[in-house]
Amino acid sequence: MVVVMLAAEEPLASTPRRDMDCVGKANTNKKLVQARLPFKRLNPEPKECNEPKRTKGPVAPKCSEPSDQENDQDSSSISHHGPALVNGRGPLDCFMSRRKRSPLRSAPEATIDLTEDSNDSAKQQPAPPIAATCPLSEEKTKTSEGTTEPTIPLTEEETEKDEAEDVDALPLLDITQDSDTEEEEEEEEEEEEQQQEAEVSHGNESVLSTGSTSSASVIASSPEPSKSAPTTPASTSRINAANKVKRRSLKSVQEQEEKQRQRDEKERLKQEAKAAKEKKKEEARKMKEEKEREKKEKKEKDEKERREKKERDEKEKADKLKAKEEQRQMKIEAKLEEKRKKEEEKRLKEEKDRIKAEKAEITRFLQKPKTQLAPKTLASACGKFAPFEIKAHMSLAPLTRVQCEDSVLEDLDRYLAQPDSTLNGLKDWTGHKPRSSGPTRPRHSAQGDCVVITESQKADDGPDRSRYGRMKLLHFHDNYRPAYWGTWSKKSTHISPRCPLRLDKDLLDYEVDSDEEWEEEEPGESLSHSEGDDDDEAGEDDDDDDGFFVPHGYLSEGEGALEDEEGGDPEKQKVRQRMKAREWENELMSKGKVKVLEAVVRGCFWEGEKPLPDFLQPYAVCMLEPLSKDEASTPEQDASRQQRNEKLLTMLLPLLHGNVNSNKVIITEFLEFCRQQTSSPTESLLNTTESIPPRIHVRRIIKENAVYEKRSTFKRCCWYVHADVLARYSQEALPVPCQWSYLTSGANVTRDEHSGSQGNSPTTNSSTTPSNKRKSASSHSITKYMKKCGESEQTEAMETDGFQADTEDDEDDDCIIIGEQSGSSEQDINTSLPQTDRETEPMDTSASETAALALPCPTPATA
């Protein structure tokens, strides 16, 4: 039986795993070996091409050859171990890849003739070295290159077995990842096959001839190439077969150990990865627990701080409440002490009254008892009703409400005496409309705000309660302040009997606690040890007088005897005493009455009829005569005025430009400078009449030619003269801040001014005038009390008559408002002093300055 094996180009690289694990080697030529059993000779048919061809068609039928029991057994064993081919492809063909191989030199094929004498040495042909692709046998492959494979005499069954084992021994891709149990089963099957091979080889030894040549085994599929050995005789075939089986078993054991080692390594790596992962998880868990613990500790700390703060606040609040309660208790105790003192004083007073009453009982017989009328006499004299007094707020109803004529009354009497039977009284009664009468209380006209009071009119007993309302006592039980006693005439639109607890925020302010605003008056100076004794004694005397009060007109027995003896008229004396008694009663009653202040209207008084009363003289209106109008200005006056303004501006520029003071200080300094220039005999720039200009004129010049603002040239706000004005007067080189030597006190001198001056002003001695003394106190700058404003706010120009460093109250000091006429024109308003020429230029004045401009303004020299 001929067994043909088609070896792949790279059997170890056919699977993906072997392709990845192994290193690429040079392709080796595969050879087809034909083995002939005894009594059967086969002619070797060498392949033209080293590449084996695979048939895609059906497999050729087996040739019918005589077979024995051993061959049948071998074939059955081979068919049992190897699966049948389907369409010429085995189970491993799907894992093999076809690659285009480079043409290699053809290797000679070895033909083994088993019929020849076994004593002859087998003809050996050099076989090309087979390069193993497995990395585990790489070194062995390198050592075996260039050596020839030894041929071992084997039987056909052994050859087939070896080929089948070689095919089975090819490293395949572990697709299913078999478990350890399957691997053990495979190992057991391999051991059984090895035992069967050993038995078969032992049984064939008697059949095979000793001189036959053993067929060459295909070693291309073996992972480890065997070393070249000389052909042995037939007696050594059993040993070689045993060695081969042993080598293969050792190889499988090594592979299993390697696999086991790889599995252990993989398991170890897996365990290490798992341990690392567990360690990482444990660290993450510990970190998370640490964070949670820190968070919890922080939360507990915050909660503790919050609780401590709350307790501290509650404690402070409790202390405040306790202090407030103690203060309240002290006030209550003080009030109770005061009340106790008052009760003690009241008790002492009652004791004194009792003593006085006892004294009065003793001296009561001295007083003349008053005669009282008997009740019967009073009832008979007054009738059913006792007399009563009609007070100011009372009025009696009229006696007859319906005023009837006598004829009507007579008809009524006649009808009552003899009623008419023809008349239907019921119809008359139902059809008759009753007459209506006016109100019982007569109407009084409402009094106006102005009440005319004559000199002879007497004061009323009290205010008219119908007009001012009833007196009310408003007191709350939880208040310390005294109750309110007075009138309350306001009516609420929200509070009503149905809603007594509604809030009325229009009339009452519920946010303010009036009890907290109440402060008890401090006790006055105690006069109990100094003047109080005299007062008490005087009070006791008054009490005694009240107890033994004798009204005017009362004469004890024997008092009027002298007057009668002198010949006085007793009737006149009684009338005189009665009048004195009435005056005395009026005087006593007027002391305890409440009088209402009422407005007194007097007038009207017409002019020219009578001289005005003296009490109206303080309120008389002063009639002012209009001011005389000046003549219109001429061009010559305008030119002279313009020239004077230019001279003033020329003198004012060194003082004004770069000055940090207000216009009030600048004007005062400039006027003082002009005054000293006038007093100097050599330097007199102006006439005597025009020497000192008015303040308002200087103010207008400053307003027209300069602005008060902050620029980059200086860090503070100061006066800056317009650039065109400086260019017109050739004063562009004026320093900022100004270097003026001040003649007056109170000016705010900057730091740069202390270093020196440029001599822009005369070096005259500073003289203090009365006007400077008067204004020195009010000329202090308040800029040092002000905070610095922002850059954007400082760059804005400020009006000269608006915000200044000082309060401008010059007009109030120098000008007096006399009057103003609505019909006066602007020309009349702009009149000025006789010392200065009349201004023709219209001035920009506000409504408040209009009256001030119309009046003559005295200068500091004339003030």
Swiss-Prot record:
Modified residues (Phosphothreonine): T111
UniProt xrefs under InterPro entries: CAF-1_p150_acidic (IPR021644), CAF1-p150_C2 (IPR029105), CAF1_p150_N (IPR029091), CAF1A_DD (IPR022043)
Keyword terms, alphabetized: Cell cycle, Chaperone, Chromatin regulator, DNA damage, DNA repair, DNA replication, Nucleus, Phosphoprotein
Modified residues (Phosphoserine): S118
BP GO annotations: DNA repair; DNA replication; DNA replication-dependent chromatin assembly; nucleosome assembly
Record's compositionally biased regions (Low complexity): 144-154, 205-237, 760-771, 850-863
Alphabetical list of PANTHER family matching this protein: CHROMATIN ASSEMBLY FACTOR 1 SUBUNIT A (PTHR15272:SF0), CHROMATIN ASSEMBLY FACTOR 1 SUBUNIT A CAF-1 SUBUNIT A (PTHR15272)
Family per similarity comment: Belongs to the CHAF1A family.
Role played: Acts as a component of the histone chaperone complex chromatin assembly factor 1 (CAF-1), which assembles histone octamers onto DNA during replication and repair. CAF-1 performs the first step of the nucleosome assembly process, bringing newly synthesized histones H3 and H4 to replicating DNA; histones H2A/H2B can bind to this chromatin precursor subsequent to DNA replication to complete the histone octamer.
Protein name: Chromatin assembly factor 1 subunit A
Gene source species: Danio rerio
Highest classification ranks of the organism: Eukaryota, Metazoa, Chordata, Craniata, Vertebrata
